[in-house]
């Protein structure tokens, strides 16, 4: 695998577990974010167990397990307790990474930090992009939560919104020693999904061509591969 391909994380947004192996082993990427909240069976134990069997595939990519709640425009409609239990079972099944929202209380975050999985703490703003100071305060808050990687995604309404978000990557590294993924969603923010890699983000999120995007503005796998080749990354 080339360095450029290792920077690409494919977002698996699928209601069915059929043909899961093809996406977990998809060529030309380095990771898969599995949006388990998109599964029809996520709200039943058997349905989740059927999906998690895919984590036993020997040749799969590392997986970032995500069960996004409705409050962050995700598909999980059960109780918060049930959602946390689903995440715990995902870690026990062998997911290498877990994505957790930054509004979770410490007593929920702590067991995940102590688990075998690495933790991404994420913050999403689907309405817009705050000013620079509130964004930096948000990074400071995320950095206190003990994650391996921080993630901030806001919705861009102007080109300048992207610049404020992208500057969080070197800011977090310099101030807190934190690896950070920071980009903007939406058509105006699309280019930041490439630029974040050039600024030092460990990976960026793309969609599989056959599947829906997990957030507005995502490139396909092939599009991001081409862009990385054009700019000479990796």
Curated annotation (Swiss-Prot):
The active site is at 124 (proton donor/acceptor), 151 (schiff-base intermediate with substrate). 3-dehydroquinate binds at residues 33-35, 68, 193, 214, 218. It is an enzyme of class 4 (lyase). Its EC number is 4.2.1.10. InterPro entries: Aldolase_TIM, DHquinase_I, Type-I_3-dehydroquinase. Keywords: Amino-acid biosynthesis, Aromatic amino acid biosynthesis, Lyase, Schiff base. GO terms for biological process: 3,4-dihydroxybenzoate biosynthetic process; amino acid biosynthetic process; aromatic amino acid family biosynthetic process; chorismate biosynthetic process. SUPFAM superfamilies: Aldolase. Involved in the third step of the chorismate pathway, which leads to the biosynthesis of aromatic amino acids. Catalyzes the cis-dehydration of 3-dehydroquinate (DHQ) and introduces the first double bond of the aromatic ring to yield 3-dehydroshikimate. This is 3-dehydroquinate dehydratase.
